[in-house]
């Protein structure tokens, strides 16, 4: 369902000045998950993440992480191309939701 995505994007649409900070935070989260995935970071560092993201970290292949990080890069590119911030954030959240969906139970 797109309802949670729209709810989050509505909260962020007026925070355009914090866009880069949000994208950095998402990128850092994904980097942390990837480092745990490849064994360079202990799993205790991701226990505060939702269970679906922890499962993705344990079970997904490397390509999932590449696609997620590419989505952050694409969000930055779209932002630079004058796409509305709300549309950028919706696209990123939609992509992240699709990637984590198989690990929800």
Each predicted region: which residue ranges?
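AAA+ P-loop NTPase domains with strong preference for DNA replication initiators
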Residues: 1-105
